[in-house]
């Protein structure tokens, strides 16, 4: 088990430099390709490059980390066969939407309190952004995230 944790830590360090080196779009595309190749989850990807251009390097890394985290949640818990990742601009803010067609959950009974969700909320909080989770049992899960641009 320790070896797995060490590999994950190494992977995160490498991915940080990958976003800087190959860019956010390619980094996200790699996550999507892995979801399909290793987990047979169809991914629809919608990225507006002008939105990415308005994000700082740090914000781009935050977006990438959130996509990684939610992709892991989808793989581990959702039993989804398809997911959509959309990165666009809305109301002069970055808008990230990640949705799946999985089993969803009842937020009233099962609060999103895992370390993955906590990390997502903390990352967005640091940029005065907002996270909204829309989910119902047997109806998938959608994360709606907004991040203000830094001027």
Report residues per predicted region.
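Coiled-coil dimerization/phosphotransfer module
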Residues: 1-151
